[in-house]
Amino acid sequence: MKIILIGTVEFSKEMLRTLIENNFKIQAVITSSNSEINSDYSDLKPLCDKNDIPCHISDDINSNRTIELIKNYEADVIYCFGWSRLLKKDLISLPPLGVIGYHPAELPKNRGRHPIIWALVLGLKETASTFFIMNEEADTGDIVSQVKVKIDGNDNAKSLYKKLSSAAQEQVIEITNN
């Protein structure tokens, strides 16, 4: 399976590393330039360079230039992890298997930004690690994989993030194998 990964945060790097370590074929990575407003920004280029994966910078994922670039790779699936802008239909419709996104919440509940913080603020006892087929709206597509994650009384944002990330790493391997 030919994969393109779109992402720009630490979670994107973790998922990319997981896919590489499990010998999946990454055609290319699309990332953005560093942003002062994104505290979780992570440079994916060094990991791509180390593994001979083309890495492209796009600050407008929906531009004709970026869509043509992605189209030329003829990917079977696009993984979009840690990208804070909505994707347009022209991009979403490219890969035959769709664009798969990730949200660290029990969709359809807790859509939108900062779901880990909200899970803690709301006093939830559990949340979920959720992969879904992306559409033009935020966090609304069909669920591909959802694993519940228990929230303990002593969890904070960092510890809950680690639990969700660990679950997601197992899920992305399973999804990609199937």
Name each model feature, range by range.
Residues 1-39:
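N-terminal Rossmann-like dinucleotide-binding module
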Residues 2-4, 27-32, 54-73, 78, ...:
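Internal alpha/beta domain cores that form substrate/cofactor-binding pockets in large enzymes
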Residues 13, 38-41, 63-67, 85, ...:
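Structural motif corresponding to alpha-helix initiation and N-cap regions
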Residues 13, 17-21, 67-71, 89, ...:
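Amphipathic, non-transmembrane alpha-helical secondary structure
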Residues 19, 48-52, 70, 124:
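A generic structural signal for well-ordered alpha-helical segments
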Residues 22, 77-178:
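Donor/substrate-binding cores of folate-linked one-carbon enzymes
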Residues 34-37, 62, 140:
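Acidic, metal-coordinating catalytic cores used for nucleic-acid/nucleotide bond scission
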Residues 35-52:
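N-terminal beta-loop-helix "entrance" segment that forms/cooperates
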